[in-house]
Regions:
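Nucleotide/pyrophosphate-binding catalytic subdomain
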Residues: 1-151
Length: 151
């Protein structure tokens, strides 16, 4: 019977703009010797105004500002994912970029809903956070794994 290992990699493990992803790949390759590995990923970190910040904190701030009527801009998140995209092989880059754009658009729409309704809570907040963080990062990591021949 094959062992099953579940490994969770939080934002700190992923690093700012995906800097530590190569270490995660090494770790997973090591873990999968004689075991099946299920990897779970949190939202990554990024650098904002010279400080390391979590995507979660940035999206919560964007949501709070949207609630007050500010038009949401996800440029910093997109820039961070573009840096992470460099870890995806050219075979999958365009497809992965489309996935990133699609998820970030869903997050932007949720933030725009918050702006229009004046409320950033519940389902709107969940959509904004999930589509910019954990769900998207899991998709991006899948492309990185494919690029590395990891299944």
């Amino acid at each position: 019977m094959t062992r099953l290992i579940v490994a969770k990699f939080g934002g700190s493990a992923i690093g700012a703009d995906g800097l530590s992803i190569p270490i995660i790949i090494q770790r997973i390759n090591s873990l999968k010797k004689g075991a099946k590995v299920i990897a779970v990923f949190s939202a990554p970190l990024t650098i904002q105004n010279g400080m390391v910040r979590s995507f979660t904190d940035i999206v919560l701030e964007l949501g709070k500002n949207a609630e007050k009527g500010e038009v949401p801009k996800l440029d910093e998140l997109k820039n961070a994912y573009e840096k992470i995209l460099e870890l995806v092989s050219s075979d999958y880059q365009e497809e992965c970029k489309n996935v990133i754009d699609s998820f970030l658009e869903k997050s932007r729409i949720a933030l725009e809903d918050a702006r229009q309704k004046g409320v950033f809570a519940d389902e709107i907040r969940s959509r904004a956070l999930a589509n910019s963080g954990e769900l998207l990062m899991s998709q991006v990591m899948n492309y990185i794994f494919k690029s590395q021949g990891i299944s």
